[in-house]
């Protein structure tokens, strides 16, 4: 019996580093194509999809500011521009396989994309378009995890999916510790007070205040995003 799809609108957050694949920098076209096909599987199941992508495959504001030459504020703005580069790349990949898309930026770049207007974003989603949100929140000192949570709340998402390289949340890094235990469900408070890395505290607090579930899953496993939407067990962890 096929699992019933319970969510109509979701926001999917990808890290910029994930786009680099096995490289430390840039965009791996094969990864981009894989992500696009995973998103298409959602759209084909009548799911409205928003996307936020980090910029760490190009530059991270915190890292750029560590040398003392570039101020943190400027470094963060540089990072925001990097997310727009990734957003345009994702737009191209999605449109290449037949999806209708829009990129909306929190910083005005009218020659490349729309400026972010939440009512317009919702209208695009209702018309079946995938909306990719770039430039973070438009403000320095906020992560793209926080931006993703904010956009998810603004557009009325049923949940936010953080697509990563692991299949959920663990009590310690599963890539370093063989005895790491997967946590299928945990509370917002547990995610905030523990040493478990899910999202930054601002993002988790925002999700908690607005009762927005956070799902962590493996983006590289084919069909996994759709499985998450169908609420199949064992392929993700949830904070709620």
From Swiss-Prot:
GO terms for cellular component: cytosol. One of its GO terms (molecular function) is UMP kinase activity. Transmembrane segments: none annotated. Its EC number is 2.7.4.22. It is found in: Cytoplasm. Homohexamer. This is Uridylate kinase. The lineage of its organism: Bacteria, Pseudomonadati, Campylobacterota, Epsilonproteobacteria, Campylobacterales.
């Amino acid at each position: 019996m096929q699992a019933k799809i319970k969510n109509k609108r979701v926001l999917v957050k990808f890290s910029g580093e994930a786009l680099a694949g096995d490289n430390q920098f840039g965009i791996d076209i094969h990864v981009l194509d894989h992500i696009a096909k995973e998103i298409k599987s959602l759209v084909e199941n009548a799911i409205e999809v928003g996307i936020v992508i980090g910029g760490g495959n190009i530059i991270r504001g915190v890292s750029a500011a560590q040398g003392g030459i570039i101020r943190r504020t400027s470094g963060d703005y540089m990072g925001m521009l990097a997310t727009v580069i990734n957003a345009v790349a994702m737009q191209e990949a999605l449109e290449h396989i037949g999806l209708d898309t829009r990129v909306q930026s929190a910083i005005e770049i009218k020659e490349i994309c729309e400026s972010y207007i939440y009512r317009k974003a919702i209208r695009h989603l209702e018309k079946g378009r995938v909306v990719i949100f770039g430039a973070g929140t438009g403000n320095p000192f906020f992560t793209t995890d926080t931006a993703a949570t904010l956009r998810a709340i603004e557009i009325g998402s049923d949940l936010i999916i953080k697509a990563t390289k692991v299949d959920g949340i663990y009590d310690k890094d599963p890539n370093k510790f063989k005895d790491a235990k997967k946590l299928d469900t945990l509370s917002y408070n547990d995610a905030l007070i523990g040493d478990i890395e899910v999202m930054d505290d601002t993002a988790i607090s925002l999700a908690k205040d607005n009762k927005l579930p956070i799902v962590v899953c493996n983006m590289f496993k084919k069909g996994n995003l759709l499985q998450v939407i169908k609420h199949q067990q064992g392929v993700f962890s949830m904070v709620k």
